[in-house]
Amino acid sequence: LEITKQLCESINFDFVIYDIFGAGELVKEYLQIPGVLSSPIFLIPPEFLETLPFHPNAEIQFQPDETSGKLLYQMEHEFGVKPKNNLQFMHNKGDISLVYTSRYFQPNSDAFGENNIFIGPSISKRKTNVEFPLELLKNKKVIYISMGTLLEGLEPFFNTCIDTFSDFDGIVVMAIGDRNDRSKIKKAPDNFIIASYVPQSEILSEADVFITHGGMNSVHDAIYFNVPFVIIPHDKDQPMIAQRLTELEAAHQLLKEHVNVQTLNEAVTEVLSNEKYKHGIRKLNDSFIECGGTKEAIAVIKSLLNK
C-alpha cells in the first residue's frame, strides 16, 4: 500500500487487476477504483470456503497473532483500509473476475454469477530450446510422464513407472525435473526417454496419455492437444482438478498412496482402451474454443470502466 500511495501521487489509475491471493482488494479499496480479479485457478466453491478457519462463519475462528494484529491496526491507521475478514488475503474478490478456464470445466459453476467471466486458458505456442528427438515419437503409442517442476523425492515413483512400462509397445517420455536425484532412478529400457526437462507442448502433440500430478497449466496444455490423463494429485488445487477431470470422464485418478505397478498399468490401459476418455477431453477442448479469450476480457473491462 505504501508503494501504491507513492505511485498515485503522479498517476491517475482507472482500475486495478489483482490475483486471488494477497492485498489486491485492499489496493482497490484504497484507490476507490474498480477492481478486476484475475484467477488462473478454479474459483473456490462457497461451501468449501465455509470449512476454512479464516471464514467469518467458521465454528473455530482463526485469530491473528500479536504482530499481525499490530500490522492490521497500522494499515487501517495509515491507509484507511482493512480486510473485511481473515479470509480476504486468501480469497480476493473483484467487481468482475476473469477466470482462465471454461465455465464447463469450473466445478459448481452454477454458484458463480455472470460477473465471473470464463475467458479460457492462454496456451503458449512458443518453441522451446530444449533438444528432443521428436522423430522417435512419430507413429508410436506415447506415454508422457511429468509431475511438474516443484515436487521432489519422486525417485520411487519414477522407478515404479520404469517397472510398469518396461514392456510397453511404444515410447515412454519421462520428465523428472531437477529436484530428483537421477542416480536414484534405475536404468530404463530402450523404450524410455528420460530427461530433466522436455518440450512439453511438442510431446503432448504426439502423446496418447499423460501421467501427471494435475497442475492447472499442464492440464490446460494437455486438453489443448486432446490428451487424456492418468492423474495423481499431490497438493494445492490438484485434488479439485483431478476430481473435476474424473467427473467429466477425461481422466482416471489414482491416489498417490495407491500407486504401484498393477494400479498404474491398469489405469493407463483403461485410458488407452476406453473411448470415453478421448470423448471427455474433446468436450473440454471444445469448451475452451468457445471461450472469448483476451478479446472478451478487454471488452468486459471497457464495459466496467464505462459504467
Label the predicted regions.
Residues 67-114:
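A short, active-site helix/loop in glycosyltransferases that binds the activated sugar's phosphate group
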Residues 106-209:
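Donor-nucleotide binding loops and adjacent catalytic segments primarily
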Residues 261-307:
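C-terminal amphipathic helix plus adjacent low-complexity
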Residues 38-41, 100, 119, 175, ...:
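Generic beta-sheet signal
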